[in-house]
Every structure is written in structure tokens, then in C-alpha cells.
Amino acid sequence: MHTNTEPTQSSDLALLGLMQLISPALPIGAFAWSQGLESAFELGWVTNEQQLGEWLEGVLDDGLTRCELPVLARLQNCWAKSDSEGLSYWNDWLHANRETAELSDEDTRLGLALMRLLNSLQLQPQIEQGHAALPQDPGYVTVFAWLAQQRQIPVRQSLLGFVWGWLENQLAVACKAMPLGHTAAQRLIEQLRPKMVIAIDTALALADDQLGPIMPGLALGSAQHETQYSRLFRS
């Protein structure tokens, strides 16, 4: 009996591509950035597992849900439609919403690192030969969206992968700098898994005029991190 396996193989390849894109082993240097979390430890805002869970939930609700996640969906749709104007608009919008020099630097450097990796994998020419122009100074989310679209990863799965990668990175920071035990990190994952799904549902439902992060505490912590005397991370 002949069985058509092409759709299954295609979805499997997309899933594997997503797993590769969010892997901690991806050589783009994401491990070097804490997104302000190290400063929260230094300032005494986060000192235990419960406070860390509250911090991460706050960043998820007031940050990613209203900034990176909905814009990632828009950027991936722009890549699908070869909408160069939309790509430039949302890429610039993300840059404008990085409230400190370190957060802006993180986004830009990770985007450049991912572009270098794509070049090493001989994928960058596919961007240059496409119908949409790559925005000037593409940030990490913009390049992530292109690779997700190129690998035919559904938008919702792209968002799931992105938020999972964010959480893993934040918990890795906490395990190094807090320090947080690995079992405690797994408890926090269990606590935040359903909240990440809710965040994606919310992000996909937001209109353009509802977007924008509301994280004054993170911005203040990130700004103070620039002059923090002793630190492990670049943000």
C-alpha cells in the first residue's frame, strides 16, 4: 500500500527547524545576555524562586505579550507577503521600544549573529534573492521571523518557540547568577507553561494600537546594569 508521507515530512522538517532555531546550542551568543535580570538580582528585587517567577510572569505579560510576540507574528506575515515596507516599519518599531542602550545592543547584536550564521549555512543568499528587502540593521526578531517563514513554521508555533527560548535563557541566567537550582527552574517552567500559551493567544489578538511594552522596572534595572561593577552578562 502506498502512503503519501510528504505532508508529514514537511511538518516534521518545520518542527525540527524550529527546534534548531531556539536551541541553546545555536551559536549566536544569546547566553551572554540577561535582559536586565542580572541587575534585578544585584538590586535585591529578585532573591528567591517565588520572586523570580513573579518577575518572569511580569516580563511575559507586560513585555513579550505586547511587544516581541505580536510583532514576530506581523514580521513573519510580512515576509510571507514580501512586504518590504512592513518589514522596515516593524523592525524600526522594535528598535524604538528598546528602552536602554544595552537592550538595543542585545537585539542588534543577536540579529547580526543570526545573520552570520545564516551566511555560514548558505541561507543568506536566499534572503537577498527574495522579493522583500531585508531592513536596515535587522534585529533578532526580524531575522528569526524570516527563518521561521523560510522553514514554513506556522506563526503560532514560531511564537511558541520564541517564548520558550526566552524562558530557557532567563532560567539559565538565574541558574548562573542567582543562583537557582535546576529543579527549581523546572518548577518555574511548569508554573509558566500555561501562562505562555495564554500570552500567545493574547498577542495574536492585539491590534496595532494596543502594542507596546510596559516595563519601567526592567528599564530602570537595565539602565543601572550599564554601570554595575561586577557582572557576568552584557545586559
Swiss-Prot record:
Keyword Metal-binding: no
Subcellular location, principal: cytoplasm
GO CC entries: cytoplasm
GO MF entries: nickel cation binding
InterPro entries noted in UniProt: UreF, UreF_sf
Pfam family, any one: UreF
Domain of life: Bacteria
Purpose: Required for maturation of urease via the functional incorporation of the urease nickel metallocenter.
Subunit and interaction comment: UreD, UreF and UreG form a complex that acts as a GTP-hydrolysis-dependent molecular chaperone, activating the urease apoprotein by helping to assemble the nickel containing metallocenter of UreC. The UreE protein probably delivers the nickel.
Name used for this protein in its record: Urease accessory protein UreF
Species whose genome carries this gene: Pseudoalteromonas translucida (strain TAC 125)
